[in-house]
Structure formats: C-alpha cells, structure tokens
Amino acid sequence: MLSLRPYEFWFVTGSQHLYGEEALKQVEEHSRTIVNELNRDSVFPFPLVFKPIVTTPEEIRNICLEANASEQCAGVVTWMHTFSPAKMWIGGLLELRKPLLHLHTQFNRDIPWDSIDMDFMNLNQSAHGDREYGFIGARMGVARKVVVGHWEDPEVRERLAKWMRTAVAFAESRHLKVARFGDNMREVAVTEGDKVGAQIQFGWSINGYGIGDLVQSIRDVSEQSVNELLDEYAELYDIVPAGRQDGPVRESIREQARIELGLKAFLQDGNFTAFTTTFEDLHGMKQLPGLAVQRLMAEGYGFGGEGDWKTAALVRLMKVMADGKGTSFMEDYTYHFEPGNEMILGAHMLEVCPTIAATRPRIEVHPLSIGGKEDPARLVFDGGEGAAVNASLIDLGHRFRLIVNEVDAVKPEFDMLKLPVARILWKPRPSLRDSAEAWILAGGAHHTCFSFAVTAEQLEDFAEMTGIECVVINEHTSVSSFKNELRWNEVFWRGR
C-alpha cells in the first residue's frame, strides 16, 4: 500500500465557565478518558489527539485556525459535554476548513438511578448541549458528520473509524496527482470532463504525458530488476506452464514486468498516485499494460482505462478509504437475464485489481483484439463474494455527481474457462432492472470503482466533504422516487 502522511484527528470538547472550575476539571478528565480509551481500540486507523476544553469564542476560533494550519490534522471531532452556547462557535466554524464530525455521546452510558442529582444533571448535558451545537451547524449550513451513541458502542466506533478514513481520503485528494498517458478513447463522452473544475473542486492535478516518456522509462529498466520481479510473480501467482520456460509466453510476462517497473518509476518520480492508459495511444510499447496495471492497483495506485481520469482518481481515493483492501477499477460488462437470478458480470480488457480475488490469481497470456500490439500478460481470477458498492463520478457540466449502487457479489456457478480476464459477478440492489434504470437516469458511467471495503455511507460523507451531489441506489430505491430525487437535486444544485 502506498504510504500516507502521519495523519491525526483532533478531539475538541465544548463547555462554558457557568458551571465552575470543578465541573470543567471533570469535563477535561472525562474527555481525556474517552480519547485514551478510543486510541486503545485497533479499529481506529489514526490517533485521536486530545485538545484543551474550549469555553470561549476566542478559544474555539483559535483551535479551528490551528487545525487548518496543521498538515497532520485530517479532521476535527467535536462533543459538547455540557451546554456550550453555540453563538460562541460561529467564528470558529466560519474558519474551519477541515472535515468536521459531531460526536453526540455522553461519558456515562446509563443514568445512575439511585444517585442522580442536579450536580450530575448539570455536568452531563450533551443531550441538549449537542442539540444547541447542532442548531448552529444547521443555521450556518456547515458540512458535518453526526454520529450518535455511546462512545464505547462498537458500532459508534466503527462509524467514527470509517469517517476517519474518508477524511484522510479528502486530505489526500487535495494533493492528488493523476498522470494521463495518451488521451481519452476517441468519441467517448463520459470519460471527458473539466480538469480545471476538478482541481478546484477536489484538488486533483491532472496532466497528460507523451507515451514516449513512459517508453523511455520502460527502456531504462535493468534485466536484473526484471528477473527479480519474475521471481516475485512465481511466489505470488500461478503461472501457465508455457510461462515458466523460455519462449514467447515467458517473454510476454517479462515485458509486463518491464512495463510495471518503468511505469512505477515514472509515477514515483512525479509523485503520482493515479494514472490512465488507453489502447489507442501505445506508440513504442509492445503491449497494453495489463498485469503491470493490476499489480500497481494492488499497491494502492488509482487507475482508469481509456483515459478515464475521474475514475482513476476515484479508485485511488477509495483505496485510501479501504486501507487498500478489496477495491478495483471495474466495468459493467455483460448481463445475465435469467428470470429471478439476474446478475451483472464485471470485468475489463485486462485491468482488474487482484485485491478483490477469491482465488489465487493465475498469470496467463492471450491475444487482445484491439490496440494492435503483442499478446499481453494478465492476472486471471474470479472475484470474491459479499456486500459491496459500485461508484461512478461524472461531470454534468455545471457540477459533479457521484452515483453509488450497493450490490451483492456472488460466486459464479460456472467456471468460464474460455474467458481470459479477471471477472466478478454481482446482483445489484434492489434488482438489476431497477438499479440499471436508476443508474442510466442518473448518467452513471460504464467505468466504476468496485469495493468490498468501502460503504455507501463513506461515499456520501466524501461527497459532503467535497461539496458535490451524491445519489445512492440500494434496496430501498424505487425508480419513480429516484426520478424525483434527481429533479429536486437539479433545482438544489443549480441554486447553489
């Protein structure tokens, strides 16, 4: 997995001086305890940092400005232990540029029925202190995540942890660099888009490079490095018999190893974490990158085929949200319309990430009928089973829209022995018919990012952080209601 910065999250508790110094000491003690206990839980991918209790407008504004200035701070978690008059928060929230989570909890889980008195009531006021704070967020239109429940509840912790990963993806987005080798596939509409608009909206730097630059990087790779990488292939994957002995199949695999090493060197030199290729721009290359792309995706790089830079960036960011697990570039390829058992077979020409594999991948070499190059090596496998999401980011001209479909991946009943590509089979929610109708009405692309590890909630949170539209297709979706949602969204987003 590509390394990330040492991110952290600030835990800020609100109160006021009305209750006296002893009460504030208890608020601080409780807040420290919560932070320390949460940090002991391995579910959290990044540490929480306790910050002093804030009780005045000046303290609140200062902590928000400090969070903005910190390269390590990826987000702020707030909690009102007591009542904290929300007008005090206006100045700080106006300044805050980091993702914000409102943890609506309280220190004690249960009411102490036998001992409860007014001292306890005055100290433990989050039930209404957080509502006051929630009002000012709504009044100001602050983008924020609200998580409700006791801080020891595993579900609360899991939601907080997933939000952390999403906030880090947002932070990574602000300096994400995409390398485009060649242009978009000719005449294709959905892979186009406003690259300047994307940099303003998401922070992405998207630039094109001549295929000759990549070819030179590939030529610079040493034979020793290729041999070492081939040894690694033999440890990790099954290889067809012809690929284990000298000959054209072995040489095809060697060529993908060269491409992988040259491509990785180019990306590392330019600090790129996402890239695109296209089969129409391969001058000087012997093969379309296949195995090379699959392995780079497994390391955490984002990828988009046919010049699809939006999906490449989305794959990278969803890799961050997923901690590198179970996430891949994908394409809806063909349908199975058996009544009562409708499914979608997802694949691509070559480039499906092995992190979604259910079986040990196998390196094979087969002809590729487009691109006019030599037969490329690729990893072939069946995808895993379980709940997952498919996500597509599109450019509507005046805004970006993120479309998410919750799906259930299933084990194939047949081996598909003649299909020479990695593939995965899924049943979309609520059904193939309704999901496809809704997807098409929303303008969803044929390229997606598929993930077992990322949730629809995380993607909704990311859309909230970046200020874009998000629509979700799931088991509750009806096409008629979805049409109305799109109409309402059109009015809302055009009015912003």
Curated annotation (Swiss-Prot):
Enzyme class label: isomerase
InterPro entries: Ara_Isoase_C, AraA_central, AraA_N, AraA_N_sf, Fuc/Ara_isomerase_C, Fucose_isomerase_N/cen_sf, Lara_isomerase
GO biological process: L-arabinose catabolic process to xylulose 5-phosphate
UniProt entry tagged with the keyword Nucleotide-binding: no
Pathways per UniProt: Carbohydrate degradation; L-arabinose degradation via L-ribulose; D-xylulose 5-phosphate from L-arabinose (bacterial route): step 1/3
GO molecular function: L-arabinose isomerase activity; manganese ion binding
Cofactors that this protein relies on: Mn(2+)
UniProt: Mn(2+) binding residues: 306, 331, 348, 447
EC number(s) from the headed UniProt entry: 5.3.1.4
Pfam annotation, one family: Arabinose_Iso_C
Cofactor-binding details, from the entry: Binds 1 Mn(2+) ion per subunit.
Keywords noted in UniProt: Arabinose catabolism, Carbohydrate metabolism, Isomerase, Manganese, Metal-binding
Catalyzed chemical reaction(s): beta-L-arabinopyranose = L-ribulose
Superkingdom per UniProt: Bacteria
Cellular component GO terms held in the UniProt record: cytosol
NCBIfam families xref list: PRK02929.1
PANTHER family: L-ARABINOSE ISOMERASE
Membership in a protein family: Belongs to the arabinose isomerase family.
Functional note: Catalyzes the conversion of L-arabinose to L-ribulose.
Name used for this protein in its record: L-arabinose isomerase
Gene responsible for this protein: araA
